[in-house]
A protein has these predicted regions:
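Extreme N-terminal segment that seeds HTH/winged-HTH DNA-binding domains in transcriptional regulators
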Residues: 1-31
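Phosphate-bearing ligand-interacting subdomains
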Residues: 23-26, 125-197
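HTH-adjacent hinge/linker in prokaryotic transcriptional regulators
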Residues: 32, 36, 41-86
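Glycine-rich Rossmann-fold phosphate-binding loop(s) that bind the pyrophosphate
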Residues: 92
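Hydrophobic/small residue at the entry helix of a nucleotide-binding pocket
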Residues: 95
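NAD(P)-binding Rossmann-fold cofactor-contacting core
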Residues: 106-130
Length: 197
């Protein structure tokens, strides 16, 4: 994400919500949306939306609204979504396979660079354009393909070991889908998804 040191964390935290709403409006064929429409959809005061967006530049026209495609592209740029991060999925169970087959992954700002598993039955099979690699070669492939994000989709009992392998391989961040709390160095950004709720 671009640096804007004078902008509040609360404003920055709302940007992904604005982006998702604009993407939905775009998918619905809406070309112009007012701050009132955005506010209604997001349950955010329209004045707050105008204030948040003004912090990043001039968007929209008074009395007209915001051009959805233009604002979506601008917020995507601020969030860094115009730069696809390469990711590797570790674990080809049901969840890993679903993530690997998800067609919208590039819309989220990611590029699937590798898939890993330890099961000999799965290694060598294909998921879309990608071949499932042996996790024994994780460090080598992460370096070769400049992989930035490691996605953990393994059972809880194996998740910490996989996290350790990803960190040792030099991964920049971890996205954990295993239902367990993991310990990673503070220098490695870490997001954990709890799918049980």
């Amino acid at each position: 994400m671009q640096e804007h040191p004078s902008i509040s964390k609360a404003t920055v935290d709302r940007l992904p919500r604005y982006y998702r709403c604009l993407r939905q409006l775009s998918d619905e064929g809406v070309s112009i949306a007012s701050s009132e429409e955005l506010g209604r959809r997001l349950s955010i005061n329209p004045e707050q939306i105008r204030k948040d967006l003004t912090a990043f530049g001039q968007f929209g026209k008074k009395g007209v609204g915001y051009y959805v495609a233009e604002l979506k592209e601008s917020i995507g740029g601020i969030l860094g979504l115009d730069q696809h991060l390469s990711l590797a999925i570790v674990g080809m169970g049901h969840l890993g396979a679903a993530l690997a087959n998800y067609q919208g992954i590039e819309r989220l700002g990611f590029r699937l660079a590798a898939i890993f598993d330890s099961n000999p039955v799965v290694i060598g099979t294909r998921v879309g354009e990608r071949r499932v690699e042996d996790i024994a070669y994780l460090a080598e492939i992460v370096a070769e393909r400049s992989i930035q994000i490691g996605v953990i989709a393994v059972p809880a009992a194996h998740a910490q070991h996989v996290a350790d392998q990803l960190v040792a391989a030099g991964i920049s961040g971890i996205w954990n889908f295993a239902p367990v709390k993991l310990h990673v160095p503070p220098s490695v950004p870490f997001v954990s998804e709890d799918l049980s709720v």
